[in-house]
Structures are given as structure tokens and as C-alpha cells.
Amino acid sequence: MDSDEGYNYEFDEDEECSEEDSGAEEEEDEDDDEPDDDTLDLGEVELVEPGLGVGGERDGLLCGETGGGGGSALGPGGGGGGGGGGGGGGPGHEQEEDYRYEVLTAEQILQHMVECIREVNEVIQNPATITRILLSHFNWDKEKLMERYFDGNLEKLFAECHVINPSKKSRTRQMNTRSSAQDMPCQICYLNYPNSYFTGLECGHKFCMQCWSEYLTTKIMEEGMGQTISCPAHGCDILVDDNTVMRLITDSKVKLKYQHLITNSFVECNRLLKWCPAPDCHHVVKVQYPDAKPVRCKCGRQFCFNCGENWHDPVKCKWLKKWIKKCDDDSETSNWIAANTKECPKCHVTIEKDGGCNHMVCRNQNCKAEFCWVCLGPWEPHGSAWYNCNRYNEDDAKAARDAQERSRAALQRYLFYCNRYMNHMQSLRFEHKLYAQVKQKMEEMQQHNMSWIEVQFLKKAVDVLCQCRATLMYTYVFAFYLKKNNQSIIFENNQADLENATEVLSGYLERDISQDSLQDIKQKVQDKYRYCESRRRVLLQHVHEGYEKDLWEYIED
């Protein structure tokens, strides 16, 4: 079966990867035509594919760790790594300068994997695809694999990893005695084919190549499985190796998806690597040590290396995660709930009033409480007063109303911060579109005897505006969980000052430019964006100082 030309990584340059000859060979010779055991075949297709592949230029390959802490350069216990640039711009630029990282392509990650497998194989000397499965089982931790490999119980190790001990390979081959010309039924489709059209794993289960191809394609494309595809035979848990997958699949898109699944498991197990979260971007950021710091991908996306969200200074990852979950749960229905429902005074389930009678019965099967809609007190004392309530000041009703008011106050507080958070998010989206308008304004200015350098202040102003919007957006998340104290008052004053200056700068940039106002606008814009930069820096420095001195107290949601 012919294969596409492309990447083929070999451990020994003198060895070549041979292809399977499905012609009139005897069954016992069939396995000898598979790729050499010292070759990891994961790349016989282009690594760039629209929607699946990677974009951007190539980096020089860095031999770094597959983990952190103090250890070797392989596995999650790995030590230091290759250096790199710190990126720039965007919120938290002052932190970016000291945080070194590299942006790698998917091809380079694949090469990292091959290098990791090669290093392990220099010791254990197994087929490359078997070593890859063993490493995957131990989350690419080389030390753990080595410890288990040499503890004297290899059979148990291979059984746990769902592979057959390579030393038994020759004995398995000798069990095959059927002639290659003899027809036999496939146990999946039950069609008869010559024996030469069948293939299988070391477990001895063989199926026709068409069924193998469809089975692997379904597992990869529909179920998203890569490193855990098992033999299709019922009850067999032996895993399919990489060479078998690449040999039996002809569709380059399926091969590419398989590559991505394998490399994704490598990245996910490595705390020094993280995929860029931008849509359709398949770059990986590699750092020297994991931390909540901003990193910038080649595609332009800046994100927090710790949590993978957009860079969110000044709020910490923990609180941003809680906020996002709260917004997902509450934002769409909170306004309607506040206007149209009340809580049962007994079980606190939310209840909607759908009739004129004030006599309410909770539908919760474990509650069934009867209460008054007006005062939220027990219904029994109301007697026959079906359509009015004269028990407003009774203690039980007052306690229920107090609990209701606290709940409503908490909701109103959430809506206050959520609305401002969303407003700045929407403004940030609009102001990203300002770059096109600013480009046109810069061209107009150059037509009025201003040089290219003289009009760069407009682009700088939009950069600062977007930075301030992003910072302000996340200050409302920080403020939502912040307890009131003297430091929080200073923070709110800094926030208000930055917010006012940002709105003024936004107004300047959206104003029409005429020849008479060019110099006047330039001076105003430059003064204002410099002031915004200064106030943003003051706000962030104050928050970071509070983190260092443990000045902030939080409201547990």
C-alpha cells in the first residue's frame, strides 16, 4: 500500500523505513515488510492543513524538558529549559519582560517527542512505537518508566500498558501458518479476501485492510482517540501502534488529526508546554518554569500561561475562574429571575407566580411548604385572607423577607459588576476595530504635510486604549470578590480615575479630524494616552503591592 511522501523520523540515518508489500508473500513474511522497529512513523503527511495544521514561521528547535522541577530534560521531572524572548505589549507588559519563553510549531513538538523516545530507547532498546506507548502510559515521565521497567516484572508492565512484550514477537509470527493465497472471511465485515489482504497486531487478531482503515478513521475523527485505540477484536485491549495507524490510513487529514492527538497528549502531560488558545492556532508556548505570567503567541494572542485565559491582570486565576463560571451560570437569566421570581422561604428554590392568588405551594417534592407571596410568611395564620396580606410584621414573615432581601441584594451587587465587566468587554471589541479607522486617519494626516513618524502617535494611542480597557474589565472581577477596607477604597479611586481617562481618550480617537485641528488633536491624544499609561501602571502596582503585603481580603462566593 503506497504512502504519501512527507516527514519520516528515523533513529538511525543508515536505516530506512520499508513499506508493506501486500502481494503474494507468505503470511509469516508479512510482518517483516512493516516499517523498521527503530523508526517512529508519525509524519508521512504535510504538517500544515487548513483548520488542523499550524501557521506561521518556524522556530529553531529547542531541546527542553517535558516537565518541571529538578530532574533530567525528559518527563515531568525535567529541569531547566531553552531560553527565549519575553514578548511585549498588551496588559501586564511590565511582567512579560522578565518571563522568558519560546513559541514552537506542532512539527517541533513532534521532534521533541521523537527525541524523548530516542533517549529512552538508548537504554531500554525497544521498538520506537512501543516506547511511545510506554511513555504515554506514564504521562511522558521518563524516570517513572525507567523505574518500573527495571523492577524485574516486565510482563506486568507490558500488560498494564496494553502492549505485547516485543521479545515475544517472533513466537507470535510462528503461529501463522495459513497460505497467503487462501481466502478467509473477515470477522468484521464477513467478506472473503485473500490472506495477504489481512493484517493485525501482535495479539494475532487479523482483519481486512478496509475494515481496519474504517475502524481507525472512526476512532480518530469521530471519537477523538489517538494513543488509546485498541484492537477491534472483542475483549482485546492491545493498543494499535503508530506505524500500524500510518500504514493503514491513506487519508492525509486523518493522519494529520492522529498526529495532533498524539502531540496533544505530549503537551497536556508537560507543565512547561501549553497550546495557544486562539481558534485554529496550533502553536505551543514553552516556558522555563510555569507561572501565572503573560505570554504572546506568533498569531498575536496574549494569554496567561497558568490558566490559558486572556491575560487578566490584576485579578488572579482562581478568582477569574470562579467569575467565568458564575457568569456562565447566572448572566442569561439573572435579570428575569430578579423581576419575576421569589425564593421559597423554606427550601430557597426559585418560584414563579403564575396566578393572582397569594397562597403559594412549593412544588419541590421534598418541601411542599405553603406560604404567602406578599410577606413570605407561613400561610396557615392568614386564614381566609386569600387576596390580601395583613401579617406583614410578624417575626417569621420578617425573617423570610430579610433572607429574600439579602439574596436580592447579592444579585444586584453581581449585576452591578457584571454589567460593567461586559461593557468594557464590548468596548474593547469595538476599539480593536479602531485600528482600521486609525490607519485611514494616519494616511489623511500624511496628506497634510505630516511625516509617517509624526502620525504614529495614533496607533500608540489605540494600543494604550485597548490595554486600559482590558485592565479595567478585569478590575471589576477583582473588585467583586474584594472585601471593603482602606486599601479597597484606594483601589476604587485608581479604578475610577483610569476609567474616566480611558473614556476621554476613546472620545478623542473617534473624533473627526480636520486640517485645522491636527496639531491640537495630536497634543491632546498624546497627553491623554500618556496619562492613561501612568494611571494604569499606578493601579497595577498598587494591586501587586497588596498581593505582596497580603493587604487584600476576599469575599468567598
UniProtKB/Swiss-Prot annotation:
Q: What is the effect of changing residue 503 to A?
A: Relieves autoinhibition of the E3 ligase activity by the ariadne domain. Hyperactive 'open' mutant that displays enhanced E3 ubiquitin-protein ligase activity
Bias-annotated ranges (Gly residues): 65-92
The UniProt keyword set, sorted, is: Acetylation, Cytoplasm, Disease variant, Metal-binding, Nucleus, Repeat, Transferase, Ubl conjugation pathway, Zinc, Zinc-finger
Q: Which residues bind Zn(2+) 1?
A: 186, 189, 208, 211
* Expression triggers: Up-regulated following DNA damage.
| Outcome (variant: residue 495 to A) | Hyperactive 'open' mutant that displays enhanced E3 ubiquitin-protein ligase activity
User: What, per the annotation, is the impact of changing residue 492 to A?
Assistant: Hyperactive 'open' mutant that displays enhanced E3 ubiquitin-protein ligase activity
| UniProt catalytic activity | [E2 ubiquitin-conjugating enzyme]-S-ubiquitinyl-L-cysteine + [acceptor protein]-L-lysine = [E2 ubiquitin-conjugating enzyme]-L-cysteine + [acceptor protein]-N(6)-ubiquitinyl-L-lysine
Q: Where are zinc fingers of the kind RING-type found along the chain? A: 186-236, 344-375
Which residues of this UniProt protein bind Zn(2+) 5?
344, 347, 362, 367
Where is Zn(2+) 4 bound in this sequence?
Answer: 304, 307, 312, 317
Coiled-coil regions listed in the entry: none
Q: What is its EC number?
A: 2.3.2.31
Documented effect of changing residue 493 to A: Hyperactive 'open' mutant that displays enhanced E3 ubiquitin-protein ligase activity
**Which residues are involved in binding Zn(2+) 2?**
203, 205, 231, 236
Annotated GO molecular function terms are: ubiquitin conjugating enzyme binding; ubiquitin protein ligase activity; ubiquitin protein ligase binding; ubiquitin-like protein transferase activity; ubiquitin-protein transferase activity; zinc ion binding
GO CC entries: Cajal body; cytoplasm; cytosol; Lewy body; nuclear body; nucleoplasm; nucleus; ubiquitin ligase complex
Q: Where is the active site?
A: 357
Q: Name one GO biological process term.
A: ubiquitin-dependent protein catabolic process
**Domain of life (superkingdom):** Eukaryota
**In which residue ranges is the amino acid composition biased (Acidic residues)?**
1-47
Q: Where is this region: UBA-like?
A: 105-153
Effect recorded for residue 359 to A: Defects in ligation. Does not affect zinc binding, folding. Does not impair E3 ubiquitin-protein ligase activity
Assigned protein family: Belongs to the RBR family. Ariadne subfamily.
Q: How does it assemble?
A: Interacts (via the first RING-type zinc finger) with UBE2L3. Associates with cullin-RING ubiquitin ligase (CRL) complexes containing CUL1, CUL2 and CUL3. Interacts with neddylated CUL1. Interacts with neddylated CUL2. Interacts with neddylated CUL3. Interacts with neddylated CUL4A.
Official protein name in the record: E3 ubiquitin-protein ligase ARIH1
Species, as recorded: Homo sapiens
